Each structure stands twice: as structure tokens, then as C-alpha cells.
């Protein structure tokens, strides 16, 4: 297994629930190092750019509106096989499904449904690279 970096974003619904500390602690307990951390609020334009891969999907506008509805926290996590492991820890996209098949996952614990699912995580090395560079400058990553 190789050491990788991946990006997570704690979404507005989880921020509103006060789940940030518990979510970050989960990744620390799983052995990840936090290499960068930033709180901000997406503008609708920047949210649209970030989620450009979904621009043709019917949920795109709703996603953009949700992601720009409140503060988020982005973090670069580093660890062995980080992309795959983080995706396993966060659970299925739909929080209702996650409660059935991965009840200890972050989305099961803090998400509501498929749209308000608490957390984003990169799904491939290519998306991790794009997303990390989109959110952070090189000087912000240790």
C-alpha cells in the first residue's frame, strides 16, 4: 500500500450539527495525518467549478445551492491507501443506505439522505489531485 493524500469536505449539514470535531477525530483515530485544514464558504460559482464533473446531472443545481448554503471545512488527509480507506470510512453516498449497510460510517452517523450526506471525499487519485489544488495552495499543505 502506498501513502496517499485525499481531500475531505465536511458539508454544511454536518457543520450545522456540530459534527466537525467528531468527524476529524475519527480520521485521526484511523491513523490519518491532517496535512491542511481550512474553513470557508463556497460561492455558488466556486461550488459549481468544484463539482464540474456533475454539471450534466439532474441534481447539480441542488448540490451547488447546498454546498454554498453555509460554512464547510476542507482537509487534506494523508495515510496508507488513503483514498480507498477514507471512502470506506465515510460510507455510501446515500446516508439512509449507509445506516443499513455501514452503520458506523460517517454518513450513517451524521448524514440525512443522499443530498445532505455530511461529507465529501475524493474518489480517485485524479480527483484528489484536482480537488486538493482547487481548495489549497501549495504553501497551505504541510
Curated annotation (Swiss-Prot):
Catalytic activity: a 2'-deoxyribonucleoside 5'-diphosphate + ATP = a 2'-deoxyribonucleoside 5'-triphosphate + ADP; a ribonucleoside 5'-diphosphate + ATP = a ribonucleoside 5'-triphosphate + ADP
Predominant location category: cytoplasm
Superkingdom of the source species: Bacteria
The EC number(s) this enzyme carries: 2.7.4.6
InterPro entries (UniProt xref): NDK-like_dom, NDK-like_dom_sf, Nucleoside_diP_kinase, Nucleoside_diP_kinase_AS
Magnesium is among the record's keywords: yes
Entries under Gene3D superfamilies matching the protein: Nucleoside diphosphate kinase-like domain (3.30.70.141)
Binding annotation for ATP: 11, 59, 87, 93, 107, 117
UniProt keywords, alphabetically: ATP-binding, Cytoplasm, Kinase, Magnesium, Metal-binding, Nucleotide metabolism, Nucleotide-binding, Phosphoprotein, Transferase
Catalytic residue positions: 120
Role description: Major role in the synthesis of nucleoside triphosphates other than ATP. The ATP gamma phosphate is transferred to the NDP beta phosphate via a ping-pong mechanism, using a phosphorylated active-site intermediate.
Protein name (database record): Nucleoside diphosphate kinase
Protein's organism: Aquifex aeolicus (strain VF5)
Lineage: Bacteria, Pseudomonadati, Aquificota, Aquificia, Aquificales
